[in-house]
Amino acid sequence: MLLWLAVTGGVLSLGSAQAHAGPPQPKPAPVAALSLRTALDTVALGSAATYTQLGLQAGPAVQQFYSQRDFTPAWTHADSAGWNHNARQALALLRCAPEYGLDPATYSWSILSALPDSLHYLAAKTATLAGYELRLTDALLRFATHLRYGRLHPLTLTPIVLTQPQTQEAVDGLRQALASPELTTAFLSCQPTSRAYCQLQQAWSATLRQHPDSLHPTTGNAADFRRVALNLERLRWDLQRPDSGDYALVNIAAYQLQLIRNGQVVQSHRIVVGKPDTPTPTLDSRITVFVTAPEWRVPYSIAVNEMLPELQNDPGFLADNNYFLLDYRGRRVNPWRVNWQRITPQTFPYTIRQTAGRHNALGNIVFYFTNQHGIYVHDTPARALFREPKRARSHGCIRIEKPLELAAFLLKREGQQAALPDIRRSIATHDRCRYDLAGGLPIRIRYYTCEAQNNHIRYYADVYCQDEAVAAAFFKP
């Protein structure tokens, strides 16, 4: 009240003086704007202490938001009557955070929604409103950021720290939502637009709306909420990956490779992935070449850990399984002339290769893409594995159920469909052929333990136990 009297008194005095001389002077700022400006003044305490005192976790973004609107309140009435219509929409949105795999408590929803009641018992309503105003803006800026980028850094699993461009993006998005006649729709437009994200988020939202008691993550389907939340987080990490055009998507946990064209699945393959102790890594690359009737160069780790004991027991193991031995110059070596008992994993000097044919561990086709792990997609002679429900059985490479269909897809999109008969001829004659792809096909290898199909959510076993680490950081109190 004293602040209001001081301001209004100043206005009356100024108005009286203007009646006699001088140009019109600017009107003083409304008391609510003055209160926000004062609250955000960091001169006395410094930025960090000021924001902590106000309970702000995104202090610089809040400061930027109000500086750009001359500290005019966005969510409260000038007459100290509490939340305005936009604020009530915003609070309703925060309450529904579980539909997006997020927790309302992260955004102080319970505290913010209590404002109308608290005003009845507080005399200093202007200061109270300013505090709530800032807290709501802070909550919405963080909510928008988490919807778009996720809460954690994908590599370190630590809370994300916004760059200045991302801060400006969040501020601009909130300003545009306020200017829109549909605040909720405009606000939610910050979410990823990928097929996988939209399908999972919408299916989960529909599930929760059918069971309103499950809206809070600590009640109802808590386990399902946690699984969906972690995978929506993973999908947000893929924000920068375009969903248009063609690409291959591998979901390790689903044992599946899909070919996607403009957001639609055009091929689906069962796959075999790495065992838990030799896991298939997540990565982005591009399939640029495939080879028919390949020879297999046995990786050093397999040669010394699995084959060396066999050779020490029986040098005929190589010939029995269509392998041959090479020295460091690439010359063939007779395994019967090697004293295998004196060879150790540390002194193993040879390369082992397997001849082309149906027996070859790579099968009839191998698809190569650049990566630091030395993995690839390939055919396999062990066809029975594709009938098993749990298919984490490889050393890290991806075995594909229908390699010829993948090869045909690659050739057709390169305009090389005339080469399809040559592939079959090469396989039949064990005559190695190489097919270079000018454009290549992007391949994304991911680990999602749930996904939506036909508006139903499918949950997969956490075969590599990766959910635990993400959950520990994501749900950290």
Residue spans of the language-model regions?
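Cationic-aromatic interfacial patches
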Residues: 21-160
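Bacterial Sec-dependent N-terminal signal peptides
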Residues: 1-27
